[in-house]
Structures are given as C-alpha cells and as structure tokens.
Amino acid sequence: MTAPSMSRPDDVRPEVLDFKPYVPGLSIDEIRDRFGLADVVKLASNENPLGTSPVVQRTLKTKADLAFRYAQSGNPRLTRAIAAHHGVAPERVVAGNGSDEIIDLLIRVRATPGKHNIVAFRPCFSIYELQAKFCGLEFRQADLRPDFTFDWDAFLAATDENTAIAFVTTPDNPSGWCPPVSELEHVARTLPPSCLFVIDEAYMDFCGDEAAHSLLSRLDAFPNIAVLRTFSKSFGLAGLRLGYGILPERLADYLHRVRLPFSVNILAEEAGLAALEDTVFRSETLRVTAEGRAYIAEGLTALGCEVLPSWANFIMFRPPTDATDLFEALLRRGIIIRPLKSYGLPQHLRVSMGNADENRRFIAACKEILPHA
C-alpha cells in the first residue's frame, strides 16, 4: 500500500516553482552605495523628468490627515474625472493600483488555465508574460520585424479561437515604436471574435498626435477593445501606483466585482484628481520630454549609436561598443540607464528622457566613454 503524499505548509503551485520575478531598474540608493557617489542621475525607469506636480504635492500635504480612512469603494470621484478627461462613460473606467493591476485582473477574469492562451509580441512588457504564466496559461509571442516595427501577420497568426487576450503596447516598450491607428483598426477587426484586444497606452501621452495613433476615441466601433493608461509617466505619480483601464462596460463591471477592496488608496486617489487638474505641469512635461528626446537622439547618433525612432519618453539604441560595458561605465559615473538583456536584446540599451541638465550629463558621459565614435 502506497503511503499518502504529505503536503507541507510551504508547498506552492507548480507555476511558482520556476517563476522569474519582474526585474526593475536599479535605484539611486543602490548606485550611491555601490560606488560611493553623492549625486546619481536615474534615466532607467521612464519616470517624469520634472518630478511631481506642485499641485499634487500641495494636495498630498493638505489631504495627509485622511490617511487613516479607506477610499470610497470603486473610487467613483476619480473614475468620473478620468472618464471626463477622455470623453468616455464612467461605467467603462476601472482604476487600479497601477495599470499592472488591470492587466492582472483582465488575465484572471478572461482566461481559463488549460483552455485559453495569451498573445503578445516579442519582446514586450514583461508583466503580460509573468502574469499569464503565474495563472497557468499558455503564453504565445510573435516576433517583431528586424526594424522593431510590428509584424501584424505574425501576431494574428499566433491567435486562435482560444486566445483570451492579445496584448500590444503602443508606443512600444522598449523600442518606442508607435503604429498608425489604421493598423490597430485592422487588427481589431481581424482578431477572433472572442479575443479581447488590450492596447496598453502607458506612453501614448508622448506620441504627439493621439488621434493618429490611438483607438481610444473610437471604442464604440470596436467592442473587443480595452485601453490601458497610467498616472506614472506624464502625470508623475509612479510611486503612488495609479493606473486605469477603459473597457467594455460589462467587462468593467466584472473587474469591479472581483478586485481586491481599496487597492487604490485614498491619497493616490486625491493625487490623481489633482494631477488631472494640473494641465500646466502636464503640458510642460510633454514639452521637456519632446525636447529631450530630440537632443538625446541627436547626441547618440553623433556618437555612432544606432538610434531607433521613438514616440515615447525613452529611446532605445545600440552603441558602437559593447552595451554592457557602456552601461557599467555610465553607472560608475552615476548615471543609470536600462540594459535590455532581459528583453532578449543584450546589445541594446534604453535611456529615459530626464530634465535638460540630466540629459546633458548623459550625453557628456557618453562622449567620455565613446571618444572614438
């Protein structure tokens, strides 16, 4: 007789055993401690080059005494403000603890392990794959073209009647590519009828012409589309974790039902409301980012780097020397950018747009390191 197997309190699901966690960019404190530096510039995580809105800062000070309160369930004030900002029905909007929470909820609500699959490009934002695999789902990827534009034929070929969600990021991360809206319309019409097309527009604010690149204003024509946005980038609230999805109303209702209560805390909600009102700060963010993008692209090109066109608040480039060597040399000078080995691009790097002084320091350091270019 075979003895029954004994489980232990620390046993976990099979998906957890070989799970590879998300790897964030290095922090300023890490590099200060490692190299004994007093001044470190971080251009690795696509954060706001101007920091946090002064209006938001004042709001957080004023509202700090509310920290003992739970936020109102579903964050209706914030939901209405987001809806008004985009000209959509409030019933479509779901706020989350970063848009990552919305990604996770969509996967868990839409997809059944052993039945459904998830599709995205390769490379892509790693959270799509991480959460799909954590949920025990098949994750399929279509390769980008050699120039890092989207191969939609390969993308559509990866889908079938069991594809629960097809994810695309536009502008893309890490390349910065942003396809015309006509391509997105074609994909939305061609995907299997049961597939939800999730368009992650975390960086759309920076593209310069949303009407030419976003389907957000045409959702009524495409019932299979969900759009994700974030407060982390142009609104400068990355540390407060606030994002949202604009979804078909029925799907939005399901997400509200199953989400953890109070995942958007009361101070994040107040900050989001203030950020939406501070149009001056956001406009200045977009201006500084566009100027920095042009400056860094020109500077890197002059140094012999292969620079990809970008519609985002970052640039992907391939240096004329070993990418790891350049990355580490920049670290020693107190400048953090993002190596892309985890994206399968070991010879490429990604640099976020900083303020004017940070951008100059980055290019000056590259000139020191790449004098032969």
Swiss-Prot record:
Name of the encoding gene: hisC
Name recorded for this polypeptide: Histidinol-phosphate aminotransferase
Listed GO MF terms: histidinol-phosphate transaminase activity; pyridoxal phosphate binding
An annotated GO BP: L-histidine biosynthetic process
EC number: 2.6.1.9
Pathways involved: Amino-acid biosynthesis; L-histidine biosynthesis; L-histidine from 5-phospho-alpha-D-ribose 1-diphosphate: step 7/9
Family affiliation: Belongs to the class-II pyridoxal-phosphate-dependent aminotransferase family. Histidinol-phosphate aminotransferase subfamily.
Keywords: Amino-acid biosynthesis, Aminotransferase, Histidine biosynthesis, Pyridoxal phosphate, Transferase
Catalysed reaction, written as an equation: L-histidinol phosphate + 2-oxoglutarate = 3-(imidazol-4-yl)-2-oxopropyl phosphate + L-glutamate
Cofactor annotation: pyridoxal 5'-phosphate
Native organism: Nitratidesulfovibrio vulgaris (strain DP4)
Domain of life of the source: Bacteria
Family annotation (CDD domains): AAT_like (cd00609)
InterPro entries: Aminotrans_II_pyridoxalP_BS, Aminotransferase_I/II_large, HisP_aminotrans, HistidinolP_aminotransfase, PyrdxlP-dep_Trfase, PyrdxlP-dep_Trfase_major, PyrdxlP-dep_Trfase_small
Modified residues (N6-(pyridoxal phosphate)lysine): 233
Quaternary structure, from the entry: Homodimer.
